[in-house]
Amino acid sequence: MKSIAVTGYKNFELGIFKKDADEAVYIKETIKRHLLPLVEDGLEWVIISGQLGIELWAGDVVAELKADYPIKLAILEPFEKQSANWNEANQLWASEVLEKADYHAFITKRPYESPAQFAARDGFIIDNTDGALLVYDLEKEGSPKFFYDRAIQAKEQSNYYIDCIDFYALQEVVEDMNQTF
């Protein structure tokens, strides 16, 4: 596998409102634990769309991994000015992750017009990656459902790789990390 998309809940869908909240430490560690074996097996690219929450935390994780591994980060935003309506702290977070990216582009080269741009993003990213790592629990629907459904279709048609981190997996990492402190 050469490239993987990482996506999942937006931070506010998880009740997290700061990028460096305590919960973010556990989420980032979980993402790292799922990415690291893939990176060690030759994964070259992690693809995110730059949305708040799981994707930007994944960008932070990839930036950390770059110190020891030849992994690259691509940010493929669904449209121009995605962060224009975000608060200042979130805009800063997005720009910090963007600075760490090896590649950045807009899937539709215009500002937001309709939800179809999100569908175009999902299709483009799935069509141009070998798999996806999702922080998504089927028991708690949210914004990742659209990507998940499309990824499942790709899996059925072409063996698209899907690794879904649910809340039980996150809880295991929390417990594991708290035992080591």
Swiss-Prot record:
It comes from the Bacteria. SUPFAM superfamilies: MCP/YpsA-like (SSF102405). Signal peptide: none annotated. Belongs to the UPF0398 family. This is UPF0398 protein Lm4b_01906.
